[in-house]
Design a protein with these regions (language model features):
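Short inter-helical turns and helix N-cap capping residues of alpha-solenoid HEAT/ARM repeat scaffolds
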Residues: 124-125, 157-162, 192-193, 225-226, ...
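Long, contiguous interaction/recruitment modules in multidomain scaffold/adaptor proteins
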Residues: 154-166, 170-202, 206-213, 222-225
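Amphipathic alpha-helical scaffolding segments comprising HEAT/armadillo-like alpha-solenoid repeats
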Residues: 72-78, 107-121, 144-155, 177-188, ...
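Structural detector for internal amphipathic alpha-helices that build alpha-solenoid repeat scaffolds
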Residues: 98-108, 130-142, 166-175, 196-209, ...
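Short, Lys/Arg-enriched, disordered terminal segments
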Residues: 1-7, 286, 360-381
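Membrane-proximal soluble helical/coiled-coil segments
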Residues: 77-177
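N-terminal topogenic membrane-targeting module
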Residues: 25-123
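N-terminal signal-anchor transmembrane alpha helix of single-pass membrane proteins
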Residues: 1-41
Length: 381
């Protein structure tokens, strides 16, 4: 089994585990749904009644003591996952019915209670811990209690339970604190059960804070991480910032660097064309060494938006490769360069069967795509 296959299967396993979490969670919800829904509706009505009375007096903010009194009146203990779920649904119902102000008043009054609850849920069954991380992501608001909650989430993020880890990381991304996200990445990097890099990349992309600050801090700590974490970071940077060219160029041209990291850097320059990177990409794409086919394939794709001396020549050279992926990427990039059938006649009429067949394949593929688009347009009329 190749390394790429292992990565695909590992990523699939992580995705499957999260699907299983959602399925189990939904099954539990269905079993308790009638009772929970009825109770949530009752809590919502009680909240609305309080809000209406407060509106008459001009006071819509809930102090913590009032929140605690309300919870006691309604026999809700947020330390119990069933009651936490009921409360969550009740507040969500308010917001869904256009009563966001009423919901927000309660949520803000709840903030001082969250640190103690977060520590309490850490001691519970990890599925409950995982759910509380979701609760925090949804109901935490920026306050003086953030530092305590961030520390709790770091503890959640190092649990062996995968659901707990991923939910905790999602909450940390939602908090938008770059310092703590980097701390969480560092902890994931050191764990035996590593979080798949695609999951980590997608999480970083969802970060709600300043991406420039997060990227700066990740680059500063870059050499401290293992290769898999580095790869996740590079892919994140590729999607979020065009201001890291010098950093990426150094990785791309470092022959001692891990090849997967170099590939990531090459892809970066495919997304953000840079004149200084052009000659290196041309060199990679023109490399006829069979063992270097991956460099040639990635570089051929990256040259799609480059023009100037050497680019077309390198792509035509890549089109003669014995490797299908190199040929395909070269053909796509030649098309992107705007080369028509007539301009590619030297390739089509040449003696190299691989190159000729690939261009024929791409031209036929493009024709089929256009036909499908025309069919869709015809159906929509």
């Amino acid at each position: 089994m190749s390394g790429s296959e292992v990565l695909i299967y590992a990523y699939g396993a992580v995705c499957l585990s999260m699907i299983m979490f959602n399925m189990i969670y939904n099954i539990v919800l269905r079993k308790k749904e009638p009772e929970t829904t009825m109770k949530a509706q009752k809590i919502k009505e009680a909240l609305l009644k309080k809000y209406s009375a407060d509106s008459d007096t001009g006071t819509t903010e809930w102090e913590t003591v009032r929140v605690q009194a309300f919870l006691k009146e309604e026999d809700l203990e947020l330390g119990k996952s069933e009651d936490l779920l009921t409360f969550s649904e009740a507040v969500s119902l308010l917001a869904e019915e256009g009563l966001e102000e009423a919901a927000e008043g309660m949520i803000r009054g709840l903030q001082p209670l969250l640190p103690a609850l977060s520590e309490d849920y850490l001691k519970k069954d990890k599925m409950q811990t995982a759910y509380f991380a979701v609760f925090l992501e949804k109901f935490r608001r920026r306050s003086e209690y953030d530092s305590a909650l961030l520390e709790s989430l770091l503890k959640y993020a190092v649990q062996e339970n995968m659901y707990c880890r991923i939910n905790a990381l999602d909450a940390l991304y939602a908090f938008g604190n770059a310092e703590y996200v980097v701390k969480a990445v560092e902890k994931q990097d050191k764990m035996d059960a590593f979080l798949h890099e695609k999951v980590l990349t997608e999480g970083l992309l969802s970060f709600s804070g300043d991406h420039r600050e997060l990227i700066k801090e990740l680059i500063r700590r870059f050499e401290e991480f293992k290769v898999k974490t580095k790869l996740a970071i590079l892919n994140y940077i590729r999607f979020k910032s065009e201001d890291c060219k010098e950093f990426m160029y150094k990785i791309m041209t470092d022959e001692e660097e891990d090849r997967e990291l170099r590939f990531a850097a090459v892809r970066y320059f495919g997304r953000y064309p840079w004149e200084q990177a052009r000659s290196v990409l041309i060199e990679f794409a023109s490399d006829k060494e069979v063992l270097h086919w991956e460099y040639a394939a990635v570089a051929a794709a990256a040259l799609k938006d480059y023009r100037g001396d050497g680019v077309l020549s390198a792509l035509k050279t890549a089109l003669y490769s014995s490797n299908w992926y190199v040929r395909y990427n070269a053909a796509v990039s030649l098309e992107a360069a705007g080369m028509s059938y007539n301009r590619l006649i030297d390739v089509m009429a040449g003696n190299d069967r691989y190159a000729r067949e690939m261009m024929e394949y791409r031209l036929e593929e493009r024709k089929l795509v256009k036909e499908r688009e025309l069919q869709k347009e015809g159906k929509s009329e």
